[in-house]
Amino acid sequence: MMMNRDILFHQQQQQQMEENMSNLTSASGDQASVSSGNRTETSGSNINQHHQEQCFVPQSSLKRKRNQPGNPDPEAEVMALSPKTLMATNRFICEVCNKGFQRDQNLQLHKRGHNLPWKLKQRSNKDVVRKKVYVCPEPGCVHHHPSRALGDLTGIKKHFFRKHGEKKWKCEKCSKKYAVQSDWKAHAKTCGTKEYKCDCGTLFSRRDSFITHRAFCDALAEESARAMPNPIMIQASNSPHHHHHQTQQNIGFSSSSQNIISNSNLHGPMKQEESQHHYQNIPPWLISSNPNPNGNNGNLFPPVASSVNTGRSSFPHPSPAMSATALLQKAAQMGSTKSTTPEEEERSSRSSYNNLITTTMAAMMTSPPEPGFGFQDYYMMNHQHHGGGEAFNGGFVPGEEKNDVVDDGGGETRDFLGLRSLMSHNEILSFANNLGNCLNTSATEQQQQQHSHQD
């Protein structure tokens, strides 16, 4: 019996082992097939998912706009409260202490302290609670329409105070006003703790003021950059063409100045009678037969372009004109020198004196402390001083502003023998006549003395 049981048990174990082996092989095959199928499915799903991601990339990249306030439930009850109701702070008053409350439930809770009967509203399960939305009472407000109504009573109150109410709360530090007390308290906590510094050095405690100031500074910097010339462009402009153009401008300026002194027709809206009256008084020795007494190509004013240094800048700086005292000293030196023959001495004397007087008159008319102040400005001031209502209208150099300010003795000496700093046109001409007569008389006397010595 025992041997039969052992044999049966041994056979059962062998059968069980064979079944396990067969199950393992079948399971491995099924698993392999399942894994291969899963691989193909996962690869296919990955491809589809990648394709779907590529399709949805443009949609995710778009920025979502923020919803504007006031998007109520279409089924909500629209409440339109009056401005008086919205601005009321104490709608519910306590009968004992006359303390006001905004809500009835706050009043009921307050009554407990007075040992008064109080009652809170109880909601029953049968009552259907309908949501309420509130519109702004102002007709021109965007929240006046029911589609833009606000869903909170506190929110509509604050909106009405901020946009349409009076700003009662003022910050003591920055003087900014608020209509809502909570906004004022929130601002007071951070006011003065943070500073906004501009590049120009100005400090601001408020961000909005800083932004406004910064925009103004940026605009001013752009305008200044446009107005200031570029140094590289200035250096590049030092070309022969530029100097030729500048020389032509200077020649035109000198020729126009000579035409004003020598001709009776002025370049400007002046009357013909006034121009003839002024130039009839010019002495003949000033407008001599020799149009070029000082050798400057027929111009009373020497060309500015001749003294331009091409290595520095394209804008020539005019050399300071000689003062009247220096010219008189030069005249004394020229008068002290003697020529070899009387004829040459007489010619050189007359030429020197004519050159001196012409240069002196030019210096009196063109020796202000500031460059660019010439005969046209002197004549314009003199013309306005004598009642003439018309002035030059850009006859000399177009684009330049006329300087009507007279220097109070800060520059070099302009007058002769202690006269005032600016003489009228008639006084200059009379002085020139007297000076010319004196010079001619002295030259004649000197010539007579030389003839007497030779005899």
UniProtKB/Swiss-Prot annotation:
GO molecular function: DNA binding; DNA-binding transcription factor activity; zinc ion binding
Zinc finger (CCHC-type): 196-219
UniProt xrefs under InterPro entries: C2CH-3rd_BIRD-IDD, C2CH-4th_BIRD-IDD, C2H2-2nd_BIRD-IDD, IDD1-16, Znf_C2H2_sf, Znf_C2H2_type
The keyword Zinc-finger appears for this protein: yes
Residues in coiled coil: none
Motif (Nuclear localization signal): 156-163
Subcellular location(s) per record: Nucleus
UniProt-annotated binding residues for Zn(2+) 2: 198, 200, 213, 217
Keywords, sorted A to Z: DNA-binding, Metal-binding, Nucleus, Phosphoprotein, Repeat, Transcription, Transcription regulation, Zinc, Zinc-finger
Biased composition (Low complexity): 248-265, 288-299
PROSITE patterns, alphabetized: ZINC_FINGER_C2H2_1, ZINC_FINGER_C2H2_2
Region span, SHR-binding: 206-218
Pfam families named among the record's database cross-references: C2CH-3rd_BIRD-IDD, C2CH-4th_BIRD-IDD, C2H2-2nd_BIRD-IDD, zf-met
GO BP terms, alphabetized: regulation of DNA-templated transcription
Zinc finger boundaries on the chain: C2H2-type: 92-114, 134-164, 169-192
Phosphoprotein as UniProt keyword: yes
Amino-acid positions noted as binding Zn(2+) 1 in the UniProt annotation, renumbered to this chain: 171, 174, 187, 191
Stretches for region Disordered: 1-52, 235-351
Biased segments, Polar residues type: 17-49
Function noted in UniProt: Probable transcription factor.
Official protein name in the record: Protein indeterminate-domain 7
Natural source organism: Arabidopsis thaliana (Mouse-ear cress)
Lineage of source species: Eukaryota, Viridiplantae, Streptophyta, Embryophyta, Tracheophyta
Gene: IDD7
